[in-house]
Each structure stands twice: as structure tokens, then as C-alpha cells.
Amino acid sequence: MRLMHPLDPARLADWQIAAALEPGLKPIGQVARDFGLEDREIIPMGPLVAKIDPVPLFARLTQPRGRYIDVTAINPTPLGEGKTTTILGLVQGLGAMGLSVSGAIRQPSSGPTFNLKGSAAGGGLAQCLPLAPFSLGLTGDIDCVTNANNLAMVA
């Protein structure tokens, strides 16, 4: 017997699941406070996205550190489950066990945005939200890296 989730990935596209879940997301300031970060330690990039300012965080380097799981490479399945889906699944699973957990994933390249490879945002019920800002540049850092590389090539 298969358990049915109201947002069944077998019946709905990833974007439909994201659109249904995004209105219920916590504001990024609340997420940061839940992890013990102060407002001065984050740089909001809209209501749902922020960067963590490394300067005020240096004072925390003397505190005990948690555990770390590094997902560096994986052979994607035929359904496209790769590193991002694995990381998001780990975060969701450990969170369901009552652990305080976060995940860090790299910003996707523009290839997924233009449907040239996987979405790089996970999929189904294990995807990165908010989906559109994540897929379309998030904080703009990837554009800065691209421009720096282009400048280095012509200089």
C-alpha cells in the first residue's frame, strides 16, 4: 500500500509542489533566529532569502562545533536524483528526528534554468524553496563570479 501525500510527486510537477508550499514558508529572519543568529549576522535578500555575514560570526569560532556531512559527488538516478535532492532529503530526515539541522548547497548554474540538465533544486517533496529565486540567481553571487571570470579572460 502506497501512502499518498496531498502533494503527490507522482501526480504534480515540481513547480506545482513549490507553488503550493511557498506561501507557508517562514520569513528568513525567523529562520535565522531559530538557529540562534542575530539580525546583525544576516543580510536579507528579500523576505525568504539571506546571506550570512561572516564578520560577526567569527566570534562564534570558539564554540563547540556540530557534526558535518559532506555530499561531494553522486551518480544521479535515471529520475535525476542527485546531490541537491540527497542533501535536502538528509536535512528533512534529520529534522524529522528532532535534530537542529541546516544544509548548505551551492547556487545552480544557468544550465538547469534553461532546461539543459537537472533542476539543481532537488525535486518532488525534497526541493529547495523558494524555487524561482533559487533557480534564477538567488543572491546574484553567481553573476558576480561569471563576470569576474569573463573579466579575467579578457584582461
Positions of PLM-derived features:
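Flexible phosphate-sensing "switch/lid" loops adjacent to ATP/NTP-binding sites
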Residues: M1-A155
